[in-house]
Design a protein with these regions (language model features):
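N-terminal amphipathic alpha-helix/helix-capping segment at the start of soluble metabolic enzymes
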Residues: 2-56, 90-103
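Alpha/beta enzyme core
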Residues: 46, 51-53, 59-114, 118-198
Length: 198
């Protein structure tokens, strides 16, 4: 039985002090659940709300890429300077130590390689939510092709990944791909980033 001695002060609930309502510094994420906020907090700096992401997922469409031939040698020395690493599950598992204190964004889609003129056709899910959870991913990245023939399919993949990620508290990142024949203009990027945010 609990000791009754000294428990008279246990009824002081400080009703005159309001409960702290802590805001959340990542824009648009104040309504998210605990798991989602926890993962976002690992990626974004609390003072600036910004993040430095180092992406090395190029090999999944480009094959061997100059400067990234030995990811196990070139990426780990850069980790102290970044907030988030983005790569495919295979590269992250084989080249990045799970003991590294850095957020991980896993590329979860596949797309056509650079061997095809139209790279926006033929994409799909390469890493499902179970694999993302098993890897303790802080974010899932989906390639999108705004203004290309595969736009609709890529946005469908983004929406379904966001639905699944929300269910498990894992944020989804929409990555904007600029097609070979598309101009890299401010107007294009304003349109593309707004579409992905919506």
């Amino acid at each position: 039985m609990a000791d009754n001695i000294g428990n008279k002060a246990a009824h002081d609930y400080h009703l005159d002090v309001p409960v702290a309502q802590e805001g959340f510094y990542v824009k648009g994420a104040a309504h998210c659940d605990y798991g989602m906020k926890s993962r976002l907090a690992r990626m974004f700096h609390p003072k600036s709300g910004n993040a430095v992401m180092l992406a090395f997922d190029h090999g999944y469409i480009m094959g061997p890429t100059a400067g990234l031939e030995r990811i196990d040698l070139v990426i780990p020395p850069l980790i102290p300077y970044v907030d988030v690493l983005m790569g495919t599950r295979g590269v992250i598992r084989s080249c990045i130590s799970p003991a590294q204190r850095v957020a991980r964004c896993v590329r979860v889609t596949y797309d056509a390689t650079v061997l095809f003129d139209e790279m926006s056709n033929g994409g799909g899910i390469a890493c499902d939510i179970e694999n993302a959870v098993r890897m303790n991913a802080d974010c899932m990245a989906v390639q999108t092709f705004i203004g290309a023939p595969g736009e609709s399919r890529s946005l469908e993949l983004l929406a379904r990944t966001a639905d699944t990620g929300t269910r498990y508290g894992i944020p989804t990142l929409g990555v904007v791909a600029v097609g070979k024949d598309m101009e890299r203009t401010e107007k294009f990027f304003l349109l593309a980033t707004r579409v992905l945010a919506e």
